[in-house]
UniProtKB/Swiss-Prot annotation:
Belongs to the glycosyltransferase 2 family. Pathway: Glycolipid biosynthesis; 4-amino-4-deoxy-alpha-L-arabinose undecaprenyl phosphate biosynthesis; 4-amino-4-deoxy-alpha-L-arabinose undecaprenyl phosphate from UDP-4-deoxy-4-formamido-beta-L-arabinose and undecaprenyl phosphate: step 1/2; Bacterial outer membrane biogenesis; lipopolysaccharide biosynthesis. The lineage of its organism: Bacteria, Pseudomonadati, Pseudomonadota, Gammaproteobacteria, Pseudomonadales. It is an enzyme of class 2 (transferase). Its EC number is 2.4.2.53. The chain crosses the membrane at residues 235-255, 270-290. Its main location: membrane. One of its GO terms (cellular component) is plasma membrane. This is Undecaprenyl-phosphate 4-deoxy-4-formamido-L-arabinose transferase. GO terms for molecular function: phosphotransferase activity, for other substituted phosphate groups; undecaprenyl-phosphate 4-deoxy-4-formamido-L-arabinose transferase activity. It comes from Pseudomonas fluorescens (strain ATCC BAA-477 / NRRL B-23932 / Pf-5). PANTHER family: UNDECAPRENYL-PHOSPHATE 4-DEOXY-4-FORMAMIDO-L-ARABINOSE TRANSFERASE, UNDECAPRENYL-PHOSPHATE 4-DEOXY-4-FORMAMIDO-L-ARABINOSE TRANSFERASE-RELATED.
Amino acid sequence: MKPYPIQFVSIVIPVYNEEQSLPELLRRTEAACRQLKHEFEIVLVDDGSRDESANILQAAAEREDSPVVAVILNRNYGQHAAIMAGFEQCRGDVVITLDADLQNPPEEIPRLVAQAELGYDVVGTVRNNRQDSAFRRWPSKLINLAVQRSTGVAMSDYGCMLRAYRRTIIDAMLACTERSTFIPILANSFARHTTEVLVEHAEREHGDSKYSPMRLINLMFDLITCMTTTPLRLLSIIGFGMAGLGALFALMLIVLRLIFGATWAGDGTFVLFAVLFVFTGGQFIGMGLLGEYLGRMYSDVRARPRFFIEKVLRSQPAAPAPAVTVDGLTSTHTDQVSP
């Protein structure tokens, strides 16, 4: 693994209804980036916020010599689509993704950049002393385990969005055309060298989590169906297993009927119904998984854009001082011109 030279760093932050945390987020993120020896930009993507987030981002981007780039989407497309929109607009050799809720401190950015300079394609993070509820932690652990089994890349915390990506990984992800994606997994599918660092995790100070129970369920389906065909293979295995169990059970019923007579068979009616419901449930699960895959194929065939960018706002460099000519001598306001 060779060191990776970095000239420019981009920070990409998706924003959705975060007007209360934005002033502190901008201040802390810019202060953390000032510690770097590289040039930098802070790309904030407003994902269809219903509060004043877009106006705050626009004002920040319009400041003279501001490092902020404001990307305004026309509606809400979801966290990962917003990040992909930021990837399209950023130009860094290394790109850092960060959530806007300040649960992961921006002060960790220099550590991730230092790891990326060592030559890693992807630098993941693991949340230390995670402040989320058990309702969020346990499903996250199950998802991480399932992702590790599906991708073969052993990372401990796929749910933490504070991550660093090399430019080549960003370009590879932008070349993908699927509508639904999960960026940490997609990045690892292109990465050769990956690592993780331990980062602090704070409680959310403003607002509520944007991941409701229904959104978490949708995210789990995205993880299951958008990155691997393993569930389809498991479905075939389960189907063969259930068919085998059904054949054995039918054989057992025939033998028991021959031994105990028709009376026993009548008493076993409820057992048959129970088994029928089990197999029927398995069939519906399989049909649901097939429906998910077919739905995603339908979305990809339509080839609609993943998002629509309404506008991009960048700061303009400071205008040069006007030249003043006195007695044939030209000067700016910083020069001293003798009368």
